[in-house]
Amino acid sequence: MSTLNQGDKAPEFTSKDQNGNAISLAQFKGKKVVLYFYPKDSTPGCTAEACDFRDNYQDLKAQGIEVLGVSIDDEKSHQKFITKYDLPFTLLADTDKSIVEAYGVWGEKSMYGKKYMGTNRTTFIIDEEGNIAHILTKVDTKAPTAQVLALIK
């Protein structure tokens, strides 16, 4: 689990988005950022989470909130995911695991009694100054936007 705490400076990163463009956290200084980590493109829980952010994206933008999704999937996978579900926000391809490791969300998981390494679904809300305002570890994949907005208000 994350070793970061509320109030900590959010770790800086630069990564490729779904189109191969370099995106850094510093680009969003002055805005609130919902940085959400998810295990895998096009899986049921991850799709529900992304679609909820999609469905509420205009409300988030109207409040000055940027949404960035992060998984270890590559750019091509992200492009398919975005196209299939009409996602309006940026997905970062953390193929070298540098962001998931910096944020402490890469770790051991268990499914059907088997242990494996993977991304623990976690959402960070980063304030306008680049500090971690909130960390959400118990994400409701069907209503993550409501969880985020409840914390921000």
What are these regions (language model features)?
Residues M1-K153:
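Chalcogenol-based redox active-site neighborhoods
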